[in-house]
């Protein structure tokens, strides 16, 4: 018998959103990818790296990427670590701060991959639910677990916790408070300033969503230098290849392109939300590049299948607390108009 660790043998593993073999055959609104291509400067930077240099190892520290992020966010480079997607940062935070048997916690519902990463480490998982007005339910005055993950804006719902509340949490969490800002660029709010004020605050970011680089796997964390030093100890030593590093620098450097893409997505999101309400769908006001919406009959599976039959992919969760609704990524205006036409047909 294969001698798997007990915690690995009993875990189910994370199930990502459906990826069709031919994405071009669908309107793909199920994994919160950006509706628009990356900046042309990104493509130029990648092509400039293709050639003789590929036989050489990349910069193990991703210094150019750290410096670009530091300039953008107003930190010194030693406060930044670059990663193979923000998932690598989340994984390494648990490896660095949670021993086997320690507790980590997160908001439910949010990114269930936190639980998967904790299970790999052998840590215990606790979740805190939400009240009807999007507050944390039954959260203690002092949380003594090793890490508390806060996705802001929340996914799948899209609402945001206020900066004041996040600062309050920083004082109530004894361990590390990790603010996962995967979708923060669509909201305009950030907790980055709290990193300077509280030694236990880490902010994670990704270039997958707002910078259109999901296919490159690029993320980063902003934290105190001593936290970054710990993450540097355990990350893969060549975690970003040459192409990814070049893409990161170019993407972060082209803020005009970035801002225009975000503007168009937010504008389409607000239009789509208003159109859904005309069909009597309930829509949670969203600060991400997606909306969580519930049809009048609360049968999310029925609407999901109707859209799937029309080659429109959205996200339906089997979780009974989410199965009544759908999370729909925001595509181009044309894609969302076609989606609305399909929803009118489905009824």
Swiss-Prot record:
Pathway(s) annotated for this protein in UniProt: Amino-acid biosynthesis; L-histidine biosynthesis; L-histidine from 5-phospho-alpha-D-ribose 1-diphosphate: step 7/9
N6-(pyridoxal phosphate)lysine: residues bearing it: 209
Lineage, uppermost ranks: Bacteria, Pseudomonadati, Thermodesulfobacteriota, Desulfuromonadia, Geobacterales
Protein name from the UniProt record: Histidinol-phosphate aminotransferase
GO molecular function: histidinol-phosphate transaminase activity; pyridoxal phosphate binding
Coiled coil residues, start to end: none
Catalytic activity: L-histidinol phosphate + 2-oxoglutarate = 3-(imidazol-4-yl)-2-oxopropyl phosphate + L-glutamate
One Pfam family hit: Aminotran_1_2
Keywords: Amino-acid biosynthesis, Aminotransferase, Histidine biosynthesis, Pyridoxal phosphate, Transferase
Family: Belongs to the class-II pyridoxal-phosphate-dependent aminotransferase family. Histidinol-phosphate aminotransferase subfamily.
Cofactor(s) it depends on: pyridoxal 5'-phosphate
GO biological process: L-histidine biosynthetic process
Subunit comment: Homodimer.
Gene that specifies this protein: hisC
InterPro entries recorded: Aminotrans_II_pyridoxalP_BS, Aminotransferase_I/II_large, HisP_aminotrans, PyrdxlP-dep_Trfase, PyrdxlP-dep_Trfase_major, PyrdxlP-dep_Trfase_small
EC number: 2.6.1.9
């Amino acid at each position: 018998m294969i001698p798997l660790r007990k915690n690995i043998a009993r875990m189910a593993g994370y199930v990502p959103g459906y990826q069709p073999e031919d994405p071009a055959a669908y309107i793909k609104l199920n994994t919160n990818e950006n509706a628009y291509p990356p900046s042309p400067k990104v493509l130029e930077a990648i092509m400039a790296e293709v050639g003789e240099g590929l036989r050489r190892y990349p910069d193990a520290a991703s210094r150019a990427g750290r410096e670009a992020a530091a300039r953008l966010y107003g930190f010194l480079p030693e406060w930044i670590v670059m990663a193979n997607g923000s998932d690598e940062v989340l994984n390494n935070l648990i490896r660095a701060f949670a021993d086997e048997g320690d507790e980590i916690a997160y908001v439910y519902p949010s990114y269930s991959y936190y639980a998967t990463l904790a299970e790999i480490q052998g840590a215990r998982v606790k979740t805190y639910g939400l009240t009807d007005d999007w507050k944390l339910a039954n959260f203690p005055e002092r949380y003594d677990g090793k890490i508390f993950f806060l996705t802001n804006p929340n996914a799948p719902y899209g609402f945001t916790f206020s900066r004041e509340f996040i600062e309050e949490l920083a004082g109530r969490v004894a361990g590390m408070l990790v603010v996962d800002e995967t979708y923060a660029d669509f909201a305009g709010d950030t907790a980055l300033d709290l990193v300077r004020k509280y030694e236990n605050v880490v902010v994670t970011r990704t270039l997958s969503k707002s910078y259109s680089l999901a296919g490159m796997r690029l993320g980063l964390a902003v934290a105190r230098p001593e936290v970054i030093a710990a993450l540097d100890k355990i990350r893969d030593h060549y975690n970003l290849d040459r192409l990814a590093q070049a893409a990161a620098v170019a993407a972060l450097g082209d803020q005009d392109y970035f801002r225009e893409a975000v503007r168009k997505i937010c504008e389409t999101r607000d239009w789509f939300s208003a159109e859904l309400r005309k069909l009597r769908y309930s829509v949670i006001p969203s600060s991400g590049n997606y909306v969580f919406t519930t049809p009048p009959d609360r049968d999310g599976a029925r609407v999901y299948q109707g859209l799937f039959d029309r080659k429109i992919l959205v996200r339906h969760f089997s979780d009974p607390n989410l199965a009544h609704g759908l999370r729909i990524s925001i595509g181009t205006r044309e894609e969302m108009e076609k989606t609305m036409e399909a929803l009118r047909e489905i009824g």
